[in-house]
Regions:
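Residue-identity detector for glycine
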Residues: 8, 16-24
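Non-catalytic ligand/cofactor/substrate-binding and regulatory segments of enzyme domains
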Residues: 24, 28-180, 222-224
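Active-site nucleophilic cysteine motif
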Residues: 78, 175-197
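Short helix-capping/linker segments at secondary-structure and domain boundaries
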Residues: 88-91, 195-203
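Surface-exposed patches in mature extracellular/periplasmic domains of secreted proteins
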Residues: 173-177, 201-206
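Short terminal or interdomain "cap/linker" segment that borders an active site or interface and mediates
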Residues: 207-224
Length: 224
């Protein structure tokens, strides 16, 4: 089997079989480029799901094993995405993450949403936060794969991304409340921002052999 990089569906094709022209049907690593991460622009990072956390990683593998079995394919590596945006005013980390404490202001939190169900979201343990964190950090960024990927050097697009963060929908994480065809999660947050900023989110590929559940949902909702 020949593994290819796709976002929300399968992660491999029979050897010698050509793709149907849809995004992800390629074995090129052209998306992985060396960039000057100190210059203004937008950089995308792909982090293995559960990097640095054995529980999340194990749960992710179980989820992917079940999904792959139902879809009749081999399991993929799952990825979580985050952005680093640099503008004249500074460097900002944009990411969706669990709420760890009540110091969200220090992490540039602009919104929160429920995890699993709206009822459970009454408790901090079952809420996520959207960060626009000046001089922030991406936990376990050292484990990022084929990253960073420079999406644009355009200052206007970079500022647009930053301005859009508070406008991102905050539906229940792990559910398809938006009717997008798949669950909403951290990847949906990032792809929504990229699509709404005017960049081509559909042309972005995950690392080879990987999958980013929720990515397509963000694009679908951004088009509405």
């Amino acid at each position: 089997m020949l593994r290819v990089a796709v976002l929300g569906s399968t992660c491999e094709l029979p050897r010698g079989e050509k793709g149907n022209g849809s995004r992800g049907d390629t074995v090129s690593r052209a998306d992985c480029r060396q960039v000057d991460t100190h210059s203004d622009g937008i950089d995308l990072y792909w982090l293995p799901l559960g990097a640095g956390g054995q529980s999340v990683r194990l749960n992710g593998r179980v989820f992917e094993a079940v999904t792959a079995r139902l879809q009749g394919r081999s399991p993929c590596d799952l990825y979580h995405s985050a952005l680093v945006v640099r503008v004249l005013e500074g460097r900002f980390v944009i990411e969706q993450a669990p709420i760890s404490d009540n110091k969200g202001v220090e992490r540039g939190v602009v919104a929160e949403g429920p995890v699993g169900s709206r009822w459970a979201g009454r408790f901090r343990l079952f809420r996520y936060e959207l960060r626009r964190w000046r001089d922030g950090v991406i936990p376990d960024v050292s484990e990022a794969v084929e990253s960073p990927r420079r999406l644009t050097n355009d200052p206007g697009t970079s500022r647009r991304i930053l301005d859009l963060v508070p406008s991102v929908p905050t539906p229940v994480w792990g559910r398809d409340e938006m009717g997008a065809g798949e669950m909403w999660n951290s990847n949906s947050f990032i792809s929504w921002l990229i699509a709404r900023s005017g960049l081509d989110a559909e042309s972005i590929h995950v690392p080879m052999g990987g999958r980013a559940p929720g990515w397509d949902a963000g694009i679908v909702v951004a088009r509405r």
